[in-house]
């Protein structure tokens, strides 16, 4: 595997899940990789994403020292910035996902230029327009609230 820039990276959205992802890692990847995705067009940037483990501390009286334990894993939120295109099928799906109040998540696939893929399940938490200036490109800023681990599929 070599290093790359982000150029050529693509992100896709699939229809809403109808159940929770399987707890088994391999089964979740099998399910996610078998879905039909729509590419989100005109993507300028994909914000940071990935798990952070919460710090749980315990202050033992006898030891006089804090102990750190691992708590909840949180993949956080990721901000997508796209050039606004009301006719783009992927952006239409993002808006539909934003308006959807279901408890189930939407699968996303991030495909890198070297063929590696990340999958995750998220809710679309915001849908804002920006770049409204004389020489600005009208953009859509979308926040994804990630509710699963990041399933990395590495090419051999």
Where are these regions (language model features)?
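Short beta-strand and beta-hairpin "edge-sheet" elements
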Residues: 111-150
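A generic structural signal for short beta-strands and their flanking turns/coil linkers
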Residues: 74-78, 102-106, 140
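Solvent-exposed edge beta-strands and adjacent loop segments
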Residues: 2-81, 125-137
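Residues within well-ordered beta-strands of beta-sheet-rich folds
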Residues: 79-81, 107-109, 143-145
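Short, acidic/charged, Gly/Pro-enriched secondary-structure junctions
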Residues: 90-121, 125
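Viral virion structural and adsorption modules
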Residues: 1-5, 143-145, 149-156
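Short acidic, gly/pro-rich beta-turn/loop elements at beta-sheet edges
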Residues: 21, 90-92, 118, 132-134, ...
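Charged, amphipathic alpha-helical segments
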Residues: 77-97
């Amino acid at each position: 595997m070599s290093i790359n820039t982000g150029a050529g990276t693509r992100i896709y959205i699939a229809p809403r899940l109808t159940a929770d992802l399987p707890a088994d890692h391999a089964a979740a990847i099998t399910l996610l990789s078998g879905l039909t995705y729509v590419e989100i067009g005109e993507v300028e940037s994909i914000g940071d994403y990935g798990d952070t483990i919460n710090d749980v501390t315990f202050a033992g009286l006898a030891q006089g020292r804090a102990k750190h334990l691992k708590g909840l894993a949180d993949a956080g939120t990721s901000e997508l910035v796209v050039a606004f295109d009301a006719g783009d099928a992927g952006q239409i799906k993002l808006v539909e996902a934003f308006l959807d109040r279901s408890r189930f998540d939407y699968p996303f696939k991030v495909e890198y230029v070297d063929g590696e893929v990340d999958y995750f399940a998220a809710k679309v938490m915001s849908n804002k327009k920006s770049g409204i200036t004389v020489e600005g490109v009208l953009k859509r800023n979308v926040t994804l609230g990630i509710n699963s681990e990041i399933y990395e599929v590495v090419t051999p």
